[in-house]
């Protein structure tokens, strides 16, 4: 979920591929919706003076940056977008050479109900003033955006990763409880 995590994963893959000669598919997950949700929570909890429209571009901006790095450095990875919270987390990814997973409720059902043209939007640049404001006002956006913004030791505790993990574990525990109740 941070640019540095993506780079480190790709560098590790390239090193191991060179050592072993094996190049299995590499999927690099960027979960833009969860990144946005984390930052929106931070803005609310810390009363940060920033427009919601700007915050809502953060996850997709980071994904676009990582995508460009993949192509510039010729990394053999494919982005798999996930964690969609809104339709834009799918529609704004159209046009990139990537894969996106979406939820049925609130995304797929909404898309199927629309009668709209498919528009390639992924190549649209994020306005520089949006990036500048995100960098200036949201420390975890800066950490996730900048090369070297976080170290390997910080990956596990990086805010968006913590949010993703806690949501996953909550759902996993619910599944285990359901299974337990059926036995």
Please state what every model-predicted region is.
Residues 119-183:
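C-terminal extensions of enzymes
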Residues 1-121:
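Catalytic alpha/beta core domains of metabolic enzymes, predominantly
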């Amino acid at each position: 979920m941070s640019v540095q995590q993506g780079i480190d994963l790709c560098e590790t893959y390239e090193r191991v591929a060179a050592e072993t000669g094996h190049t299995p598919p590499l999927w690099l997950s960027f979960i833009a919706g969860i990144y946005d949700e984390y930052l929106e929570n931070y803005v609310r909890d810390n009363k940060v003076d920033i427009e919601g429209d700007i915050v809502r571009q953060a996850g997709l901006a980071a994904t676009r940056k990582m995508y460009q790095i993949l192509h510039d450095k010729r990394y053999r990875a494919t982005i798999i977008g996930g964690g969609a919270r809104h339709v834009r987390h799918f529609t704004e990814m159209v046009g990139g050479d990537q894969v996106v997973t979406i939820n049925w409720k609130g995304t797929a059902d909404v898309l199927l109900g629309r009668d709209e043209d498919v528009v390639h939007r992924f190549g649209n640049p994020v306005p520089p003033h949006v990036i500048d404001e995100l960098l200036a006002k949201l420390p975890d956006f800066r950490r996730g955006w900048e090369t070297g913004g976080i170290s390997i030791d910080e990956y596990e505790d990086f805010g968006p990763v913590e949010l993703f993990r806690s949501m996953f574990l909550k759902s996993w525990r619910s599944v285990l409880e359901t299974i337990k109740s059926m036995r």
